[in-house]
Amino acid sequence: MKKTVFRLNFLTACVSLGIASQAWAGHTYFGIDYQYYRDFAENKGKFTVGAKNIEVYNKEGQLVGTSMTKAPMIDFSVVSRNGVAALVGDQYIVSVAHNGGYNDVDFGAEGRNPDQHRFTYQIVKRNNYQAWERKHPYDGDYHMPRLHKFVTEAEPVGMTTNMDGKVYADRENYPERVRIGSGRQYWRTDKDEETNVHSSYYVSGAYRYLTAGNTHTQSGNGNGTVNLSGNVVSPNHYGPLPTGGSKGDSGSPMFIYDAKKKQWLINAVLQTGHPFFGRGNGFQLIREEWFYNEVLAVDTPSVFQRYIPPINGHYSFVSNNDGTGKLTLTRPSKDGSKAKSEVGTVKLFNPSLNQTAKEHVKAAAGYNIYQPRMEYGKNIYLGDQGKGTLTIENNINQGAGGLYFEGNFVVKGKQNNITWQGAGVSIGQDATVEWKVHNPENDRLSKIGIGTLLVNGKGKNLGSLSAGNGKVILDQQADEAGQKQAFKEVGIVSGRATVQLNSTDQVDPNNIYFGFRGGRLDLNGHSLTFKRIQNTDEGAMIVNHNTTQVANITITGNESITAPSNKKNINKLDYSKEIAYNGWFGETDKNKHNGRLNLIYKPTTEDRTLLLSGGTNLKGDITQTKGKLFFSGRPTPHAYNHLDKRWSEMEGIPQGEIVWDYDWINRTFKAENFQIKGGSAVVSRNVSSIEGNWTVSNNANATFGVVPNQQNTICTRSDWTGLTTCKTVNLTDTKVINSIPITQINGSINLTNNATVNIHGLAKLNGNVTLIDHSQFTLSNNATQTGNIKLSNHANATVNNATLNGNVHLTDSAQFSLKNSHFWHQIQGDKDTTVTLENATWTMPSDTTLQNLTLNNSTVTLNSAYSASSNNAPRHRRSLETETTPTSAEHRFNTLTVNGKLSGQGTFQFTSSLFGYKSDKLKLSNDAEGDYTLSVRNTGKEPVTLEQLTLIESLDNKPLSDKLKFTLENDHVDAGALRYKLVKNKGEFRLHNPIKEQELLNDLVRAEQAEQTLEAKQVEQTAEKQKSKAKARSRRAVLSDTPSAQSLLNALEAKQVEQTTETQTSKPKTKKGRSKRALSAAFSDTPFDLSQLKVFEVKLEVINAQPQVKKEPQDQEEQGKQKELISRYSNSALSELSATVNSMFSVQDELDRLFVDQAQSALWTNIAQDKRRYDSDAFRAYQQKTNLRQIGVQKALDNGRIGAVFSHSRSDNTFDEQVKNHATLTMMSGFAQYQWGDLQFGVNVGAGISASKMAEEQSRKIHRKAINYGVNASYQFRLGQLGIQPYLGVNRYFIERENYQSEEVKVQTPSLAFNRYNAGIRVDYTFTPTNNISVKPYFFVNYVDVSNANVQTTVNSTMLQQSFGRYWQKEVGLKAEILHFQLSAFISKSQGSQLGKQQNVGVKLGYRW
């Protein structure tokens, strides 16, 4: 056992200030966020204990300086919450004597959280420094009060020893200084300092909260004092956050860092200063020697020192019930004779004295209050180094006196119900004290010291325990009545203590609390059930240090959420649906054993929620049966904002709790297994990792990750109140999103019995997923899984807009869906399984077999070698360039086999080598159906032998269904100079070019003739072999390995190269002749349509001749259809011009209706919507959606009318290959119409401007101006109410030229001048129910011809032709006139040479004066 000299260790840290006999850390710099000073004082935000190099920025975001560069951040837990004192001994604080207004102190966290169980320590004696005595040479404004209990929440701070203040100016030995206080709060500005005036902003009164920072620099020293001076607006040697004292800071502590001892020490307490400027402060140095010699020694008069050699002393303790007691030591004599006794008198609680009394303070006017009764009790020190026994004869109240033990002791009562009451128990290192006595009800036993308190009395103890250090073992035994309770309430505080259970019934679990900074609850292999765990902060820790027994923690949640109406001081936490535990489960110290511990969440109802926001490190399982279980990080704690609304707005911070969504603490959770047997488990935001295997079952569900820019349920616990809230939050702020890490889910996930798991957003699963029994798994919203998915028995997995790095295996009616994602790994599907791809792409890594496959606008890439550059040109892989078939797994061609049904629509992407007739393949059953596109990337080399490249084959030689359709992307595959088409031959699909195949056939015939010559010179066996090969359908031009045959082939190849060279240097006419000669021979294996060959040949001619179009124009019949040859850029240019002109025609169509209609409206508006599809031989089909709005006015004349129409048209056009175009047209038109009897004659003129823009980012708007004029005539036949009106008209259009560039393609459109002809007839019938109402249905047929307009548009250097065609319009409408209002509506159908069958509707409203 370690022997230590009796000198109590005391540790405290705090800062405070006094002003000229008054309590004055209240001045801070307005240019720095006030929250820095608040967080500094409470060890929150950046200023956590031990932090270093803390950067401080001003309100403009500029770096002011760095705090704590030479020392770790101090622990301010030793400072009283009112800021006027600091803990320097087990029950002693230090301050200034003129602070007479405080009679108690408390320690710990701020806030109203009832789980903290804040304890009030009463001052029983002031211990004012008696300066008038000769032996006391220092100022009398100093005291070190004694408290009635040992303080458990904090460890006392060490004190400086030198009373010569100048030694502390040495910044080498003392590089850091800080202070803290709760005086009046002022904000000081640069201008205040420059003009030497009081600080501008008085923001708070004294004693409401703490602020802290570094001190000013030392400017002088006196007799037991030091003086510091400076200003708060400028950083100094100690840091960027200097603070100055104000009224209310008297007694607040100043701390200094001892570089040699590497620890913070309390240096002084603030006495004087400049209360309105925050400049100089005067401090009283700490008087350590006086404390030990004249304070602690007086309060610990009874000292039983250790004996050498150790003895087993027996002590008897009895109260005389008059404020004194007798302590008798019986020990054997050294010579072994009769035992000897030592008797001592000790002071106890003295009820005969006053409860409170006043003590005159000479350092300041007034009196101090103290408690004579309590103070009368003194400490007892027992230093027996054997195994001592202390027997308490009767109930003892030791007042403010406590028991110190050095060595092993047994403390027992004469009877089981004997009680002891006092300041507490302190046990030295390596010592164990067996505690067999009770403490009275409502009394708290304070346990300090690093030794062990073994509580093993009998019966039911009604007192409570606060464990602040060392270990407490609860091993209470049952009395004769079977009652057993170690304590009614057990508190674990300061983070230094461990409470160990030796049975489950030592204390009611719901009466265990983790106070300020918590500590360890060691279950020691036993199990507890909590309604909720009372906890204050992340210092709470529940562990199992037992090496053999498993322990369980069960949490049930609050049974009732309705608080009783007849009860006062309701603890809302006991009636809340949502509860939280902010501490740890499982040991985190690697030097301590982490035994097996299981956590079970078993709420009574489904609407209960448990938030775990601390962490777990379990060798055991986490099990949930119902309710909601959240795993989450937590907001970084910040000091509470006590400022009122005005000051808070100036600082730009919310009132009350400071929670910034971008400033959270990440948490980790670890368990062997997560068993989710019911309810919902949620792994929420700021969980950096969660480790363990998951099993989700019985309709339960689990969700991992949060999704940016979507609503997420986030749960947080208030540090201030302890209450937990869960709310829906939309994570849209970029700063917040960037602060949330991607949750690493390390482990496998198993789903059974209709379970559901969702992994989405900021989450990554590193493990496999197994699903059975109708369970569902979803990976979505950019989440990632690295691992395999295995599905069976009707399970369903979906990957939607996410990344899966692993294989998928399906059995027994399972289903897998890939949506909005790209997948690079293997999928294998057994019988009755289905794979569905929706807006997805899948790249196969190797051969794949599936049962059923459904594509919905998706792409399957059969080979990773397939890729395309931005301009759709193939990007070649070396493996496909080789002249031999690739053999390695990386470079081979792949086969996709679908044994069941292929359905839907999508794209299959292949790699191929026509040179070697090798490619990826698709093998299908005769159940396959649907429409698909094949995209083939070829090496670019032309074939040199005659074979067939089959891409799609049937299984078991069964023909494929006619319901199965494949279309080649771009209708061709380029290979060398030719384009290959997709043909269906004997139920299979292959690439085919008749010209090339005929050419190769001719080469093969010549090769066969050469072989026959060689065969005559060879033995019969060789000849037979060569003959057999020649008959094969897939025979190569080179078929013999013999030297003579190979030599002949070399000669043939050389000749072929020579012929190719000649062909390339010949004129186009020679090329055409060669192609025609190739067509004259028959291709016996694959018959083909000669007309198709003609078209294909002509197309080749057109492609070769395009650069010479201007010089050698050819008619349309020779060229084929232009739209099949032009690029998307050319097509978009022609489509854009067509769409612009058609918008102008739409305006004229409305004017044509106006001329035919005899409406007399003076003012009208017209709205027309239509959707049209245009197509021609010049450009590919496009769709135009137009919204036309018109306002018109007209004036009636004697024999006619005149008027004007303003038109505005907006069009959304979709050209081929989904090229988007947006266009507007604005026109102003005027018209006049004259009537001779039934004959009408009219004229019109118009001018307008169009603006059009392609959707590509680099394109600019295309502007065109246009004018038109025209004439029209009509004749009206009237047969009663029936009217028949034929009409005709012509309009001349002038459209200016426009040159522009789109994606580096130059487009030139010439100026246009053309006529638009129209003719038609209208039939109507008029009903007149009353004089003021008429109704007129009508039928209208109109024919428009613009075929005379031929345009030549130049794209780069190629001239393209374009016309505008003709079209019919049929319209049915109804016109009604009520009083002066006119309303008409119509439905029309249109169709023409370039216009498909279309419908449009219109509404017109007019008014006539």
From Swiss-Prot:
It holds the Pfam family Peptidase_S6. Probable protease; promotes adherence and invasion by directly binding to a host cell structure. NCBIfam families: autotrans_barl (TIGR01414). Residues 1057-1067 have a biased composition (Polar residues). One of its GO terms (cellular component) is extracellular region. Keywords: Cell adhesion, Cell outer membrane, Hydrolase, Membrane, Periplasm, Protease, Secreted, Serine protease, Signal, Transmembrane, Transmembrane beta strand, Zymogen. The keyword Transmembrane applies. It comes from the Bacteria. The lineage of its organism: Bacteria, Pseudomonadati, Pseudomonadota, Gammaproteobacteria, Pasteurellales. Its EC number is 3.4.21.-. The active site is at S250. Residues 1068-1077 have a biased composition (Basic residues). GO terms for molecular function: serine-type endopeptidase activity. The signal peptide, cleaved at the inner membrane, guides the autotransporter protein to the periplasmic space. Then, insertion of the C-terminal translocator domain in the outer membrane forms a hydrophilic pore for the translocation of the passenger domain to the bacterial cell surface, with subsequent cleavage. The gene is hap. Residues 1156-1409 form the Autotransporter domain. Residues 1-25 form the signal peptide. It comes from Haemophilus influenzae (strain ATCC 51907 / DSM 11121 / KW20 / Rd). It is an enzyme of class 3 (hydrolase). One of its GO terms (biological process) is cell adhesion. This is Adhesion and penetration protein autotransporter. Residues 866-888, 1016-1078 are annotated as: Disordered. Disulfide bonds: none annotated. Residues 26-294 form the Peptidase S6 domain.
